[in-house]
Structures are given as structure tokens and as C-alpha cells.
């Protein structure tokens, strides 16, 4: 029994999100972009910090300029945009807006991004976990539909392409999503949109119960600044802006996003190389004994190795200098620089030899 009797008992067993220390050698565990900002842009941001951002003043609380810039980039209206301190804050706000107060449960298809379940549990919201197909990682539509019918599902969480498995939603899965009742919020997490180039945005106007989440942490190389955004119905956006914490984005993070969007073409110019490296890694992993690797539409690959416990393999790899994420009964390998990718393969060959 916990000595602190004011704590909720269910939180005592909740595990925090696990992350590898930043000083790790080759960090291929967090789906970060492998290259930092170009020096010229970092200098521009540094000059803004030095000359244009008063440290004694709070940042822009309403993000109006940033909303306009994001709307222009995404092809949406500023009234459809809400910003969060990472997509995690937006997920939490969406769950508060829909499920808190015993209004319903959250449906997740696992393996998937773990923060949906973690945040729901932290808010005391029931989580309905439906396993994906063990070979294809497709949704089990029969069990999903049964959960919707029987478990008071208020929110369906879908990552497209899914993390950690890298697969996008199929035609049948989209048909199921489009048939969900209007009282269920569908969160469509497009964190890897820039890599997959697939978006639900063209159909958003037909489905006011859909909301898209995106991030600047991946393709725009802004993981250190923690900025995510939602695209949704203006009334939903108004609620999100009302319940989020005040001044949730630092001034320097807001300016970093502005700079990234002003130079989006330059920042996204390396995406073809990432896709090329991903495909080369996929082919190389396929050739290794006992390795089962799945195709990916994102900047990572998911695989399993026959005869190996994923955690043991993760530890062995990390001891040699490559960090990967162990999740969902397998390993997720982020696409790094060509040099990091080559070292990762050489070390894996050494382990499996």
C-alpha cells in the first residue's frame, strides 16, 4: 500500500514513457530526423533570440501568426488549427474534451503509439485495446466494430502510417472509419505525413468528428522544440484552445516553426534521401538470417528476429553503439544518416553471426 493516501491507486502502476538518454551513440530509437538544422537557420533563430525575443515577457498566447503560417502550409483555414506542446498535449486535450467524467472509452489498435493509452489512463479513462493482425498489422475490423457497439467508445485513435509498424490504413479500414457514428471522435495521427504524403485532409469537411494531428518534431527537425498541431472543425478547435494551458509554446519554439515554414522546401529537401535509405535498409534486413521486416511508409522500419527476445537484442545492439526501440514484440529502427544505417547493419550482423 502506498503511504501517500491522497494518490489515485490506479496511477501507482502506470509506467512513464520510456526514452533512451540523449548522450547515446547512434540514436535510432525515437524517429527523429538524422540531421540537425542547417547552421544558417540556427544562426537566424539565435539572432531572433538575442535581438527580438524579450525574456521577461510571456510568448504569444494565441499563436495567430503561427496558425496562419501552418494553415497556408497544410492547405487549411487558420480557424481549423490548434497548437500544442507536442502532439501529446493535443491528445490529452482531446481526451479531456470528450471522455473525462465517465463519458466513454478510448479505442486503440495495438501495437501503436503508446501515449494514447498512457494519457487516457492518466485521466482515468478506460482503454479498449484491440490487437492488430499478427502478420499484416491491419485492424481487426470485426473486433473494432464490436468494441464500438459494446464498450461505449467515444474516441478512436489511429496513426497513419502506424508507429511502430509503418503500415498505412487500407481501403477497407478507411471505409470502416468513414462509417463510424458522428458521436465518436476519430483522431487521425499524421505525424509521418511528410514521409508518406497521405492525408485525410480532403475529406475533413465531410467528417466534423475527425481531427488530424501533425508534428514539427519529425521532418522539420524540431523535436527539441516540441510543437504539434491539430486540424479540425472550428468548434472543436475553439474548445481545444480554451482548455489548453496558457502560454503553452515558448517564444523561441514559435519562431523556430515560423522559420521552418518560411523555408519548408529547403527543410524537406532531404526526404527523398530518407526514403532511399529506408528502402535500402529494408532490403539489407531482409537478407539477414531469421529477420522478418515489414514495409514502411514512414522514416522507420519494424522487424523481429527468430530466436531472439526483442529486449535482449535491443540491449546487445545498444552495447555496440546503436539504440533502437523495443515495442509491440519487435524492434523499431529509425532511418538515420547513411553512416549510422551502415553501422547499425554491421553491428546487427555481428550480433546474429
Swiss-Prot record:
Its cofactor is pyridoxal 5'-phosphate. The keyword Amino-acid biosynthesis applies. Its EC number is 2.6.1.9. InterPro entries: Aminotransferase_I/II_large (IPR004839), HisP_aminotrans (IPR005861), HistidinolP_aminotransfase (IPR050106), PyrdxlP-dep_Trfase (IPR015424), PyrdxlP-dep_Trfase_major (IPR015421), PyrdxlP-dep_Trfase_small (IPR015422). The modification N6-(pyridoxal phosphate)lysine is found at residue 218. Homodimer. Belongs to the class-II pyridoxal-phosphate-dependent aminotransferase family. Histidinol-phosphate aminotransferase subfamily. This is Histidinol-phosphate aminotransferase. The gene is hisC.
Amino acid at each position: 500500500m502506498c503511504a501517500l493516501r491522497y494518490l489515485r491507486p490506479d496511477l501507482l502502476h502506470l509506467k512513464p514513457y520510456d526514452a533512451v538518454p540523449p548522450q547515446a551513440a547512434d540514436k535510432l530509437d525515437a524517429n527523429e530526423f538524422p540531421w540537425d538544422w542547417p547552421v544558417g537557420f540556427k544562426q537566424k533563430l539565435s539572432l531572433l533570440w538575442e535581438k527580438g525575443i524579450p525574456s521577461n515577457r510571456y510568448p504569444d498566447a494565441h499563436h495567430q501568426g503561427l496558425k496562419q503560417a501552418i494553415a497556408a502550409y497544410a492547405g487549411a483555414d487558420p480557424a481549423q488549427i490548434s497548437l500544442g506542446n507536442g502532439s501529446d498535449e493535443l491528445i490529452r486535450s482531446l481526451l479531456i474534451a470528450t471522455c473525462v467524467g465517465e463519458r466513454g472509452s478510448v479505442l486503440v489498435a495495438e501495437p501503436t503509439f503508446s501515449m494514447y493509452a498512457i494519457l487516457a489512463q492518466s485521466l482515468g479513462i478506460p482503454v479498449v485495446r484491440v490487437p492488430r493482425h499478427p502478420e499484416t498489422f491491419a485492424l481487426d475490423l470485426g473486433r473494432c466494430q464490436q468494441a464500438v457497439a459494446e464498450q461505449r467508445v467515444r474516441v478512436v485513435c489511429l496513426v497513419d502510417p502506424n508507429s511502430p509498424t509503418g503500415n498505412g490504413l487500407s481501403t477497407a479500414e478507411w471505409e470502416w472509419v468513414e462509417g463510424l457514428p458522428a458521436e465518436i471522435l476519430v483522431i487521425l495521427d499524421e505525424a509521418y505525413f511528410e514521409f508518406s504524403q497521405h492525408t485525410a485532409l480532403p475529406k475533413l469537411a465531410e467528417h466534423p468528428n475527425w481531427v488530424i494531428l501533425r508534428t514539427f518534431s519529425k521532418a522539420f527537425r524540431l523535436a527539441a522544440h516540441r510543437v504539434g498541431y491539430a486540424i479540425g472543425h472550428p468548434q472543436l478547435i475553439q474548445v481545444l484552445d480554451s482548455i489548453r494551458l496558457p502560454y503553452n509554446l515558448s517564444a523561441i519554439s514559435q519562431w523556430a516553426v515560423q522559420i521552418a515554414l518560411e523555408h519548408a522546401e529547403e527543410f524537406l529537401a532531404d526526404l527523398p534521401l530518407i526514403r532511399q535509405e529506408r528502402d535500402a535498409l529494408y532490403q539489407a534486413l531482409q537478407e539477414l538470417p531469421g529477420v522478418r521486416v515489414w514495409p514502411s511508409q514512414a522514416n522507420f522500419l519494424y522487424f523481429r528476429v527468430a530466436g531472439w527476445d526483442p529486449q535482449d537484442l535491443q540491449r546487445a545492439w545498444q552495447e555496440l553503439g546503436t539504440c533502437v526501440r523495443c515495442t509491440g514484440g519487435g524492434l523499431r529502427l529509425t532511418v538515420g544518416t547513411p553512416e549510422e544505417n551502415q553501422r547499425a547493419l554491421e553491428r546487427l550482423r555481428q550480433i546474429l553471426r
